[in-house]
Curated annotation (Swiss-Prot):
HAMAP family: Ribosomal_uL3_B. It comes from Clostridium botulinum (strain Langeland / NCTC 10281 / Type F). It holds the Pfam family Ribosomal_L3. The keyword Membrane does not apply. This is Large ribosomal subunit protein uL3.
Amino acid sequence: MKKAILGKKLGMTQIFNENGKVIPVTVIEAGPCTVIQKKTVEKDGYEAIQVAFGDIREKLRNKPVKGHFAKAGVSVKRHIKEFKLEDSNSLEIGQEIKADVFEAGERVDISGVSKGKGFQGTIRRWNAHRGPMSHGSKFHRAVGSMGASSDPSRTFKNKRMPGHMGNVNTTVLNLEVVRIIPEKNLILIKGGVPGPNKGLVQIRNTVKA
């Protein structure tokens, strides 16, 4: 069964398993997400649910968004996201999706916006090799060759060059759910997940199952 939830990355820590082994985990505050709209094949051409997550002051939302929440009878939230789920008909508007939809041992895919690194050179951005650092060398951390000269007399598209790094949508596949703490809506994921602390993340069933 397809499952999905929005969450907020709180940070990383480490826990011990039953064998006493240290496991690095990312703590995610998952939900509660409130269903605010149901998409149907008859009306919209496909089936999906729209969920909202995170508190926000009402005056920070415009009138169309306020009306959208008022129609659902739900208080205004910060984030809105749509998910295609197999059992979307079983969910009702106003119903909450919480962290306990997942179980320990499940595999999930987590999406978020990666940390922005600003303008970076090819060594950091693309793991390029640097030149000699000794006296007399004129090639230290420069780009190097960008292409042939007379033919084709241009630099090809997608050439690895310096530029803006990070701050892009990133998905990490097949991560393990180590522990669920339902009373606090927390999910502990083995390893790291994209984005900074307090960043928005999406948790879904893995596509590699």
